[in-house]
Design a protein with these regions (language model features):
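Flexible "cap/lid" loop of the alpha/beta hydrolase fold
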Residues: 106-115, 180-195
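Short alpha-helix in the alpha/beta-hydrolase fold that links the catalytic acid
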Residues: 83, 208-218
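Serine-hydrolase catalytic machinery in alpha/beta-hydrolase-like enzymes
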Residues: 7-138, 242
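Sec-dependent N-terminal signal peptides of Gram-positive bacterial secreted proteins and lipoproteins
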Residues: 1-5
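Primarily recognizes the serine-hydrolase "nucleophile elbow" in alpha/beta-hydrolase
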Residues: 130-191
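Short beta-strand/loop motif that positions the catalytic acidic residue
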Residues: 192, 198-200, 204
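Short beta-to-alpha linker loops that shape the active-site pocket of alpha/beta-hydrolase fold enzymes
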Residues: 99-103, 180, 234
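C-terminal catalytic histidine-bearing segment of alpha/beta-hydrolase fold enzymes
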Residues: 220-269
Length: 269
């Protein structure tokens, strides 16, 4: 079943152009010194993604947890690559999947066109993300039992859609930042068999708080471990430095909660 989002308040939360800014998400001194390797890889049919992972001077480095990172409506731009690098420095192999097949938007109108194109072929978008999971599961430096999906906005909705279609290749966790569309019915969500992290703002005009509360209720009723964090006074895309809703303090806190969630439910399990 394909869920079509309500875009009310969605465009207004974005600025006219994408912006790169991850300086607010601090790294510890030891993490700053982590060396990374990155490359473009073909992971599904004609889809290419940005792959980045930490490299060790030791030959004894074991297999690492991994993340399929799913872009916002802009596409795989420099901001997404910077976020992938940031997460890789925490010890993850990160594959930034591309649902736009190399296209990157530089204005809201083009971004909306690309979103609609991806949504109009939702089955292919899911197959694309499943291909990313399979690619990581076969990578020699990845622990195939510790693969997570993470996305923001459009990508958050796709992260959830992947969770609803991952029975063949189960995930370790699902993370969505104000994901649209937000699936809330218990029957659909009961397919998920792993922990879920949801990050939302209570002033989000695209995702009513009633939907967020129903999302949490359905997860709880289905016995799905979950952490749902709702930030007061912030709206849609508050973690996006491109937008008028950008909230640096809440973004930094949400990122720390994301890392803590990954540590608890992925790294330490």
């Amino acid at each position: 079943m394909v869920f079509i989002p309500n875009y009310s308040g969605f465009v207004e939360a974005q600025s006219s152009k994408p912006v790169t800014n991850v300086s607010n998400l601090a790294l510890s001194e030891d993490m700053k010194n982590v060396n990374l390797q990155n490359k473009t890889v073909q992971y599904f049919e004609d889809a290419q993604g940005y792959l980045v992972y930490p490299v060790s001077s030791s030959d004894s480095q074991g297999k690492l947890p991994a993340v399929v990172m799913i872009h916002e409506w802009w596409g795989v731009n420099q901001n997404i690559k910077d976020m992938a690098n940031l997460l890789a420095k925490q010890g993850f192999v990160v594959l930034a999947a591309d649902l736009y097949h190399g296209k990157v938007a530089d204005n809201p109108q083009r971004a909306m066109e690309l979103v609609q194109m991806a949504r109009n072929n939702q089955n292919n978008s899911i197959a694309n993300l499943q291909g990313a999971v399979k690619y990581l599961s076969l990578a020699p430096n990845v622990d195939s039992t510790k693969i997570t999906s993470l996305g923001w906005c459009f990508g958050g909705g796709q992260s959830l859609q992947l969770a609803l279609n991952s029975q063949e290749h189960p995930l370790a966790a699902t993370i969505l930042y104000y994901g649209t569309p937000l699936v809330t019915d218990k029957q659909s969500l009961s397919k998920i068999k792993w922990p879920v992290l949801g990050i939302f703002g209570d002033k989000d005009e695209a995702i009513p708080m009633g939907e967020v509360n129903q999302f949490r209720t359905s997860l709880n009723q289905s016995g799905i471990i979950n952490e749902i964090h709702i930030y007061n006074g912030v709206g849609h895309a508050f973690a996006n430095p491109s937008g008028d809703n950008y909230a640096p303090k809440e973004t930094a806190d949400a990122w720390q909660k994301t890392l803590s969630f990954l540590k608890k439910y992925v790294i330490e399990t």
